[in-house]
Amino acid sequence: YTQMLKDGFPSYGGFAGSQSLLEIPPLDLRQVEIIKGPAATFYGEGAIAGVVNFISKSPGEEAESTLLLNQTSALGSDASLFTTRKLGRFGYTLLGQFNYQNEYDVDEDGFSDLPRTYSFVISPRAFFYIDEKTQLTIGNTTTFQNRKGGDMRVIRGNGGPQNIYFEKNVSVRNVTTANFTRELAK
């Protein structure tokens, strides 16, 4: 019942409840806002327990690029890239992430504690600085994820009639946002 927002938009939709905070690439985050209590209900029925708003970085005068490579002891690998630049009245940000998590059976009971997961995120945003007080931002985020968990023999393609339990989930999310801002007074 916690509403997750990206730059004030409900970008995660009904998937927020099943989304782990570890699945949100941190490279483009400028800050995180948390609203709890009765004030959160202003964001709708999905915000009864609170709101978490992830605020992205905006282009600065100097170019910025960050590459993050991560390998876990639980057989997971991540590669993330963030780049941003402002060129006069135009700016951009680009975030990309690839994740692979091998199926992992921590307690060796024959069932995966972590599913086999492939995921990919690409998120470009364009900033148009029309004048000192007016800005237009257009962005798109596409996320693909393929998960398969359950009986380790089934996941690895060795399942028989007695080994049939598994769960598979393939999801594609595409969110396009546009934000027009006009400052009325300074």
Question: What role is predicted for each listed range?
Answer:
Residues Q19, A47-A49, N70, G76-D78, ...:
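Transmembrane beta-barrel architecture of outer-membrane proteins
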Residues S11, K57, T72-A74, N99-E103, ...:
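Structural signature of outer-membrane beta-barrel domains
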Residues P38-A39, V51, S56-R85, P115:
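Short strand-turn segments of transmembrane beta-barrel domains in outer membranes
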Residues T2, E61-S65, S77, G88-Y92, ...:
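Outer-envelope beta-barrel architecture signal
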Residues S56, T84-L87, A126-F128, F180-L184:
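Residue-level signature of outer-membrane beta-barrel architecture
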Residues T2, F9-K36:
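Short acidic/polar hinge/loop motifs at secondary-structure boundaries
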